[in-house]
Each structure stands twice: as structure tokens, then as C-alpha cells.
Amino acid sequence: MSVMFDPQAAIYPFPPKPTPLNDDEKQFYREKIKRLLKERNAVMVAHYYTDPEIQQLAEETGGCISDSLEMARFGAKHAASTLLVSGVRFMGETAKILSPEKNILMPTLAAECSLDLGCPIDEFSAFCDAHPDRTVVVYANTSAAVKARADWVVTSSIAVELIEHLDSLGEKIIWAPDRHLGNYVQKQTGADVLCWQGACIVHDEFKTQALTRLKKIYPYAALLVHPESPQSIVEMADAVGSTSQLIKAAKTLPHRQLIVATDRGIFYKMQQAVPEKELLEAPTAGEGATCRSCAHCPWMAMNGLKAIAEGLEQGGAAHEIQVDAALREGALLPLNRMLDFVATLRA
């Protein structure tokens, strides 16, 4: 790499785990959230990786469960004046970029993402400046500032198609921030891709040794893998794809048992899609190792019922997402470029 910052060497302190609630407390906060959503003219959008009780509440209140971009697009189309975003901070920023006129609230602004943290704007800008002949493509899991520095924003569901398109135009690519997804895209397309070296702390922990042992126990199970996983895991997969693509694969594959290599939060919607199938968590520790994330993002876990209620009730600087107007305009350009590209794919 041509910059001093090394995402692979960075260690991000995990937040403390939320204090567990008893059943009475859970019911109290569920009812409080439902009341506050009505009072605030708000709708709740939740990511696939949040805890099951959060996703369930989003469903019960007419909200949305999806990936980060679809969460933001749902909010932009919804009549509510306030969006409660249950996810991590860059997701709230994306919602604000697409809905600047709305109040964007989060349970906590301290919910981070290792991909976002691993791609600080100053270092990334210097990296881009060192390679001015390359088109800059950044994953949706980045800050508004990084998006504004990019030519394109992309999601994992269309990453291969977009890079194929740019490669057909003879363009060389800078890809950021996830090195595993960038490597996957490069191998699928053969494009000239220079990768930033970030990684998701959840997907980076999947290990081939432990997975091989699990496959021996369940020899007839299919393996579903998110492309943020290491190449060695991707090569073992029966299906590779984004969160929504993995849920579709779960329905399409004939296997009755599915080993799932992504954040276990996805099990809520995946099990709804295939109630007759057995879902198994892919192991995240190799021989003699211990997991850090254990297949669940610690920042996603910060989106608890109590925090959601506090976000709706208190608002203010501790919960409201703000994006500078100039930064928003800069980030909106590559986002809209991607949305236009998606529209052409579906036409």
C-alpha cells in the first residue's frame, strides 16, 4: 500500500454488550417504542444483522428489514417524517443522504462498522490521489466522506456487474474498503482492481479448519457464504451472495440443511423464508482459537429495545444523524450513479 495507515493492523475496541432485559422489561419497551413511533410520525428500518427481536418489531410496526441501501430507499419513499435506523452509523448517514428533509434517528451514534473505521477519509484520499488513473469504487459500508470521494458506490449484490461494466470500458479500479469482497470481484471479472485492505470483523473470522470439521458432521448441508469472507471460505461455498441473495439461495437450493457464513442476525428472515430447513452457523474459530465477534457484529448488538426507545424519546445530538450539505451532495452523486446503473440492469 502507498499510505501509512494499515487497516489490517488496526484493532477496534468492541463496545460493551447491552445489559439483558427480562421479559417484563422487553414488553415495556416494545409498547413504548410502538407508542413513540406513532407520536413522532416515525417508521423503523432495521438491518438483517440486528437482533431478532428488533427485526420482529420493525415488521410489527410497518417498517422494513433489509440491507443498508434498501433501508434508506424504503425510508425515502415512506410518508413518515422521521426514520429510526436500527443498524450502524454509516447506514444512518446513507438514509440522511437520500432523505435530507427527514429526521434520521439512531439508537446510538456509537454503533460503528470495522469497514467504515478501517477506511478513514484522509488516508483514503491520499491513496486515491496516488492512483489518479483509477476509477474509485467504494462499498456502501463507508462514511459519507468516503462516498463523496468516490466515483461509484456499490452494494455486494451488484458489485460483480458494476465492475464488469467498468472493465468493459477499459477502466482500472480502486476498490474499498473490503479486501475480501474486492478480491472476489476481481476473480469473478478479471478486472484490474487495486484493493484497500479493510475487512469486516465478523466475516474475516470464518475459518476453513473449523468449517471443514462441521461439513464432515453435516455432509449433505449446503454452504452459503457472504463475499466479505476470506477467499478460502468462498471457495468452499455452494452459493455466494449478499444478504438478500443468500436468503434467495436458501429457498432455491434443494438441501434441507444450510450452513450460513455471515452474521447470524440473518437467521431471522432466512428461517422465515425456509421454515422447513435447518440453519447452522458457520464456525468462526480455527484450531485452538477463540472468536472475537462470534458471527454477530458487536455494534449491531447495540441496537437494543431500551436504546431504540431512548433514541425516539430523546432525539438530539446523541441520536440524530447530521450530514453536511456539501458532503451530502458529493456523496449523492455516486449513489445516484449506482441507482441509475441498477435501473438499467432491471430494465
From Swiss-Prot:
Q: Which GO terms describe its biological process?
A: 'de novo' NAD biosynthetic process from L-aspartate
This enzyme's EC code(s): 2.5.1.72
Output the superkingdom of the source species. Bacteria
Put simply, this protein is called Quinolinate synthase
Q: What class of enzyme is it?
A: transferase
Give the species this sequence originates from.
Answer: Salmonella gallinarum (strain 287/91 / NCTC 13346)
A molecular function (GO) term: quinolinate synthetase A activity
- Its chief place of residence is cytoplasm
Q: Read off the SUPFAM superfamilies from this record.
A: NadA-like
Report the cofactors.
Answer: [4Fe-4S] cluster
Give the pathway listed in the UniProt entry for this protein: Cofactor biosynthesis; NAD(+) biosynthesis; quinolinate from iminoaspartate: step 1/1
Task: List residues binding [4Fe-4S] cluster.
Answer: C113, C200, C297
Could you give one GO CC term from the UniProt record?
cytosol
- Do the record's keywords include Cell inner membrane? no
Instruction: Spell out the HAMAP family in the cross-references.
Output: NadA_type1
Q: How is the cofactor bound?
A: Binds 1 [4Fe-4S] cluster per subunit.
